[in-house]
UniProtKB/Swiss-Prot annotation:
Cellular localisation: Mitochondrion matrix
UniProt source species: Takifugu rubripes
Region (Disordered): 570-590
SUPFAM superfamilies for the chain: Anticodon-binding domain of a subclass of class I aminoacyl-tRNA synthetases, Nucleotidylyl transferase
Transit peptide region: 1-26
Name the record gives this protein: Methionine--tRNA ligase, mitochondrial
Catalytic activity field: tRNA(Met) + L-methionine + ATP = L-methionyl-tRNA(Met) + AMP + diphosphate
Keyword vocabulary terms for this entry: Aminoacyl-tRNA synthetase, ATP-binding, Ligase, Mitochondrion, Nucleotide-binding, Protein biosynthesis, Transit peptide
Family in the record: Belongs to the class-I aminoacyl-tRNA synthetase family.
């Protein structure tokens, strides 16, 4: 018979499977009503996970932040009042031990690493509206209030815990989640099946949360809300986990083991479990326990797949217990690997996001992560992939199109050229061909396509759709070769203006839609077109009004003065190395 977690009321002897008997005698958990978030207002609240400060930020941390930032900017583009929180998780045994190893006080250690995250996000144009640290007093107050609410509802009781615990993961594990492995000396040790981190057998008296009473409510929530957890495969994973009974959860540690954390109210001998502490940050940011409803009703979480259980089982259960609405969506993303392997210090394959953002530009790295990152599956990172993608799509396709249509050779007047309905009539005819009409249809529907992909958390598909339209527009210009037209011929002159006008309209749509992804490049593109800041919202995505017989506010307007390159081509690492070797040889000859 398999031994389970032991969750026993104070004074009971630890016996396998006895927790069922104990719970039968304990006060029953009332089934709280599931409260769903409002979808009626124009507020939007998105969060990243708060990042653990045991080490410096890596590419995966930036990926989470870029995704959240992209959704935040997208909602702002659509006129939503958006709030975006990120920050650092600074309590727990792992931090306590890391600070001791570094010879620093825990708060000093946390502040140093937290500032690295803050600096990275600032330098990569992460536009968070709040940066939360779990060592702040506002969070301390929120966590203790949340704990007290759960206690008042009879959901926390004091008992004994005996089982496996991973300090690295700050996680309790069942026997089925543990396996045997060999350490570096060949000694047998127990490790987590999921993370591979070492686990230890722990036995202590602490506080338990009645997680076992929430399984049916969680199942109801997920079945009634099939888009609550996205992508779909992760929704199914959680449903699969819920096919088994949920054991109660230890939510505190003895202070003798863990000093670095928030004390349990009215029991200074216990410290609140780091995951309960950390998850409450999402409430702290919006003012919990006072005036939080306005924002908490529209909450969305961005998380990595490794912390799905904490966010999809523990967190909703805590919220249900506290009588609070559940988040509207939990967006889950997979991980970045290098040569198919997980990044780790021991393998020496950790990608420094700060270094790469300087190498490929901030917008370049953001574009690559969102264009290549697929939420459902792990993605492999290589520098040459970054160079190839950015050169093809940002430098050549988008940058080349802008350069062609705004160059003095084709547009000597430097204006938003005029559209001629006779050259490109609504009914097929004039000098436009079938491919041109198909291109117009693609660009006209592009905002709706992009919006749907954002709703599905498929930003990479939205960018693929934009890239396809950019290629179509380049094909349109290439087919009609406006540089070959005779400007002395009035018909050719009108057709030239029409080609440029249509191309600039396409670029305006692309620049507007790309603002959440590459804000600096989009700003440069739209400024070059003469599009003012107040003309860059979702409501301005009325494509080619002259084609519909309406006025175009941009027609005849002077273009912006910045005629610089939109995105400079990147040289491959191999080319850079060859260039450096030549320079070194040259300097040696002198």
């Amino acid at each position: 018979m398999r031994t389970r977690f032991l969750f026993l009321t104070s004074g009971c002897k630890a016996v396998p499977e006895l927790h069922k008997i104990v719970l039968a005698n304990a006060a029953p958990v009332k089934n709280p009503e599931i409260r769903y978030a409002s979808t009626e207002n124009r507020n939007y609240y998105i969060t990243t996970p708060i990042f653990y400060v045991n080490a410096s930020p890596h590419l995966g941390h930036l990926y989470s932040a870029v995704i959240a930032d992209c959704f935040h900017r997208h909602k702002q583009l659509q006129g939503f009042n958006s709030r975006f929180a990120t920050g650092t998780d600074e309590h727990g045994l792992k931090i306590q031990q890391a600070a001791e190893a570094a010879g620093k006080e825990p708060l000093e250690f946390c502040t140093t690493v937290s500032e690295r995250f803050r600096h990275l996000f600032s330098s990569c144009n992460i536009s968070n509206t709040d940066y939360i640290r779990t060592t702040e007093q506002r969070h301390h107050r929120a966590v203790q209030h949340f704990w007290s609410v759960l206690c008042s509802k009879g959901l926390i009781y004091k008992g004994s815990y005996e089982g496996w615990y991973s300090t690295q993961d700050e996680s309790f594990l069942t026997p089925s989640q543990v396996t045997t492995a060999l350490d570096s000396t060949g000694k047998e040790i127990k490790v987590s099946l999921e993370s591979g981190h070492k686990v230890e057998w722990m036995k202590e008296e602490n506080y338990m949360f009645r997680l076992s009473g929430f399984r049916s409510q969680l199942l109801d929530w997920l079945r009634e809300n099939p888009r609550a957890i996205q992508p779909e495969r992760f929704h199914h994973s959680v449903l699969q986990w819920l096919q088994e009974e949920l054991p109660d959860l230890s939510v505190s540690r003895q202070k003798s083991r863990l000093q670095w954390g928030i004390p349990v109210p009215e029991d200074d001998g216990q410290t609140i479990y780091v995951w309960l502490d950390a998850l409450v940050n999402y409430l702290t940011v919006v003012g919990y326990p006072n005036n939080h409803e306005r924002w908490w009703n529209v909450a969305h979480h961005i998380i990595g797949k490794d912390i799905l259980k904490f966010h999809a089982i523990y967190w909703p259960s805590f919220l249900l217990g506290a009588g609070l609405p559940l988040p509207q969506t939990i967006h889950v993303h997979s991980h970045w690997t290098v040569a198919g392997k997980k990044m780790s210090k021991s393998l020496g394959n950790v990608i420094d996001p700060q270094e790469r953002s300087q190498l490929f530009t901030t917008d370049g790295l953001r574009y690559f992560l969102l264009r290549q990152g697929v939420p459902d599956t792990d993605c492999d990172y290589r520098d040459d992939k970054v160079v190839k993608l950015l050169n093809a799509e940002l430098a050549d396709a988008l940058g080349g199109l802008l350069n062609r249509c705004t160059a003095t050779a084709l547009n000597p007047a430097q204006v938003y050229a005029s559209f001629c309905p006779d050259s490109f009539p609504r009914e097929r005819g004039g000098r436009a061909d079938d491919d041109d009409y198909r291109m117009l249809e693609s660009v006209r529907h592009l905002p709706a396509v992009v919006e749907q992909h954002f709703e599905d958390m498929h930003v990479y598909k939205a960018l693929e759709a934009v890239s396809t339209c950019v290629r179509q527009t380049n094909g349109f210009v290439q087919r009609h070769a406006p540089w070959k037209l005779d400007r002395k011929d009035s018909a050719d002159q009108r057709w030239l203006g029409t080609i440029i006008h249509v191309s600039l309209e396409c670029l305006r749509i692309y620049g507007t839609l790309l603002q959440p992804v590459v804000p600096e490049i989009s700003n440069k593109l739209l400024s070059r077109l003469g599009v003012q800041p107040h003309e860059r919202s979702w409501t301005n995505l009325n494509f080619l009004p002259r084609f519909e017989g309406k006025d175009c506010p941009f027609e005849g307007r002077a273009l912006g003065s910045d005629s610089g390159v939109l995105f400079s081509r990147l040289e491959s690492q191999r080319a850079d190395q060859q260039k450096n070797r030549k320079m070194e040889k040259g300097s040696n000859l002198k």
